[in-house]
């Protein structure tokens, strides 16, 4: 995957995520398909929470010359939390942070992409490898969101609610 491919994939994740979930209401965001499945809200929270961590990791490596970082912790924060703010606000923040990251990446030359960073759990990797890992991870979650949202149960029409008269009749 080239640098152009990586930047394109990273820039497309917020928009693709928004396209898939803009229509979800609170009940659908919290719906759990089964005990082993995350809710759509927790998947979205996971993507939204990782964006500033990935952005910070890349900025510190680029601007501060940081050579050690926990890449996995930035890419894959906890899945346990649900979405704690309105969906639209979370998606807008995700897009804003990702635009900032992509703007940074557009300015990188070969030396920057080839700069290595040491991850205590993953060993040495280039910043291009880090971005490839982020892109693959996020695209996997986009596919997961697509699949889970396609499998949501259809809302049921329980019929017209009648007016209750005196004594509940």
Feature locations, PLM:
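Acidic/histidine-rich alpha-helical segments that form the ligand environment
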Residues: 10, 76-115, 129-134
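Conserved catalytic core of Hanks-type protein kinase domains
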Residues: 23, 46-47, 107
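Short, contiguous alpha-helical
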Residues: 7-11, 15, 28-74, 116-169
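Short Lys/Arg-rich basic patches
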Residues: 2-6
